[in-house]
Amino acid sequence: NSDIEVTLTAEPKQPGEETNGGSTSVSSNETRPYLPTGFTQVKGTTLKNGLTIQDSTGNQYVWVEVPKTGKVYPTAGLNITEFTTDEYTAIEADLHTYTDVYRDGTIYKDEYYSGVGLTSDEYTNLKKTMLKSVYQNGGFYVGKYETGIESGPKTSGSSSTEPTEIPVIKQNAYPYNYVTCSQAQTLASKMKSGNYTSSLMFGVQWDLIMKYLETKGMSQKELKENSTNFGNYYNKLYNITNIESKYYFSHGSGSKWISGAYGTKISNSFILLSTGASDDFCKQGIYDLAGNVAEWTLEYTSESSDPCVKRGGCYSAAGNGEPIAKHNIGQTSTKSIVEGFRVSLF
């Protein structure tokens, strides 16, 4: 029952144990969110509205439910304990079937390539860690916001020099852009907590978010055909009232970041926003999945010249051209104002 309020308890208790009315019970047999060491639950958040946790510095993550049921795992089943190679294959195949409508067939795969910021063994082990955690716990955490920078905006980047700005997952930060896919993975991996792993999302995780949002009321059409109403796109008109937000007005040589609410957007235009600028762009407690900056994943396009994948569209695209589920391709050296990333925790 995802309507219950969950009060998470810290490790080493079992994931999903909660305290309700003085009694301890399991939050759900299908999804068992855990509280990594050093994290606290954000007050007022539940499985119904987007269960959110934050670390000691205020970085926030939202729980994405992936129900541990026979419907989701018809081949793998619900009793895996050894996690053999064949069992990992079955888990992944079942998750692909569960999210099939968002996968774009089998063109894009969670397979290793040399520009992803990991070795082949690291990639394989990371994927196994993710699959095991999702299977055992019935979900995973994803950054509530696109990864950002508090100190100031990036204005350039180099594919040969690692960025030094400290990444945060907080509202009203400058988007952490001008990063390659491999640089984004390096940055994401350093945000881990205790026994849990932080990383860019694998493609199946992005697809699982789409399926999760579908179970919470979004239509497949809104997710895979036209996401204009839910994101900062070129063709989305809106009224930003968040006075702590910032916006980048792209206008030739006069382009610059401006602090304060943008106000009313009355015509199609290119406006990059700070993270979490408007609740209009929030679904289940997760901001800016649609538009703003495109987000690197660990997927592989199978194209040697453009092997990298970014998803969710960006502020210079139309919401019916680059909906939330959309795959876009990039080179290993691609880095610009429109590419950013989001961290997952598992």
Feature annotation, model-predicted:
Residues 16-74:
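GGW-centered surface loops in extracellular recognition modules
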Residues 70-78, 149-155, 318-321:
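Short, solvent-exposed loop/turn elements at domain surfaces
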